[in-house]
Amino acid sequence: MAALAVLRYAGSSPLLWGWGPILFGLLGSVFVLLLPLVGIEEQCCATLKGLALLRCQMWGGIQRPVVHTTSLAVPFTALDLLPQKVKPSKETQLEAKAALQQALEMKKSGKREKAHKLLVHALNMNPEFVEALTELGTILEEEKDVVQADHLYTKALAISPCHEKALVSRDRTLPLVEEIDQRHFGIIDGKVRRLMSIPKGNSALRRVMEETYYHHIYHTVAIEGNTLTLSEIRHIIETRYAVPGKSLQEQNEAIGVDVAMKYINTTLLSRDGAITVNDILEIHRRVLGYADPVEAGRFRVNQVFVGHHIPPHPQDLDKHMQELVQWLNSEETLHLHPVEFAALAHYKLVYVHPFVDGNGRTSRLLMNLILMQASYPPITIRKEQRAEYYAALDTANEGDVRPFIRFIAKCTEMTLDTLLIATTEHAVGLPGASNHACPDCKQTIPVHS
């Protein structure tokens, strides 16, 4: 305790304000390593708890959730606006507390499965019930689901930054989760190296890359409700003629993504230098240029609401976009894994939501631009993953972006696996791909003059 008193006094020194959180992180890690040692577990837990509380007293609580990546906290002021949710009624809160008490009793008597269900029930009634989040995290951690446990601790701290048990638990799980994430990145890197070792002239690789191109257009518009089939999109892109009986708006959406992808491939990828706001505007100008030429390539002028998320006011868009490109070109991003960097860029742009329409398509293209700059293939988020994709974005809006990064990492690995399998001796085409032209497509009127 004397040592803690010295640290408390030292924390008042301006020289330690920058190094203080790092110092506490290192001390916390040391005590985590001591936890398993026989005979000192309680002392270590008590000391770790003291460090966590002291950190809160010296540096204060975080007023709003910050973006937590797998390796680097990247503050971003666009997160100042958080989702506004209706609070549960007093009766519902009391019922949630009763469920928590029952869960604790069940856990004490060894009925862990019942305790788990009761805690889930409590959180269904009150999603921001910090004690229930922390207790469920503890159960998941004991069940070796450390990633989900860490997420629950993080969510609890986003709501109550100085919650004692959540602080101690998060300090314990964070290093383990970072190790898991970095190990997954290592697996992805190995698959990228295997793909890069295939000669560029390989006919199977060329064929599957062409199929992947059309698949990306199909899935990126289908995620947002476009009803065109893969064969119809291929016909539209190759002929620029309309598909009878289909919405011209939907067909122009597909052409816009195609034109934007060609712009990235022929212009941005071959150019040295920083990514600029104008680059993002030019991507969007092409994404929306056929479906809505008036709004293409310009920021929105009205406030929009996306579910519970409230994007920045139109008057603040210039500032937020300048912050975004400053971050995109900062030294901080050099320390991020390419998948992590690309996922964060996607999230930050879609969070600002600078356009009336086409924010998701533009964000996914920006993500792929960053991946391709790092010699990764462009990835596809499949329409079947729509619910998981949006859920990960919602989770990021609540203060923990790591599940979204993991989702993008999974999509990256799926894309790599598809490319590698297609170039093996017994290769097959991509799921849903067809070598046949659209059976009902005939050369009719041009989609866009």
UniProtKB/Swiss-Prot annotation:
What does the entry report regarding how activity is regulated? Adenylyltransferase activity is inhibited by the inhibitory helix present at the N-terminus: Glu-224 binds ATP and competes with ATP-binding at Arg-364, thereby preventing adenylyltransferase activity. Activation dissociates ATP-binding from Glu-224, allowing ordered binding of the entire ATP moiety with the alpha-phosphate in an orientation that is productive for accepting an incoming target hydroxyl side chain.
Q: List residues binding ATP.
A: E224, E250, Q251, G358, N359, G360, R364
EC numbers for this chain: 2.7.7.108
Where would you find the membrane-spanning parts of this chain?
15-35
Report domain Fido positions: 275-410
Which keywords annotate this record?
Answer: ATP-binding, Membrane, Nucleotide-binding, Nucleotidyltransferase, Repeat, TPR repeat, Transferase, Transmembrane, Transmembrane helix
Q: Kindly list the GO CC terms recorded for this protein.
A: membrane
Q: Pfam families attached here?
A: Fic
Short sequence motif named Inhibitory (S/T)XXXE(G/N) motif, residue ranges: 220-225
Instruction: Please verify whether the record's keywords include Nucleotide-binding.
Output: yes
Q: How does it sit in the membrane?
A: Single-pass membrane protein
Gene3D superfamilies in UniProt = Fido-like domain, Tetratricopeptide repeat domain
Functional note = Adenylyltransferase that mediates the addition of adenosine 5'-monophosphate (AMP) to specific residues of target proteins.
Give the family, as the similarity comment puts it. Answer: Belongs to the fic family.
Q: What the record says about its domains?
A: The fido domain mediates the adenylyltransferase activity.
Name of the protein in its database record? Protein adenylyltransferase FICD
Recall the taxonomic lineage recorded for the source organism. Eukaryota, Metazoa, Chordata, Craniata, Vertebrata
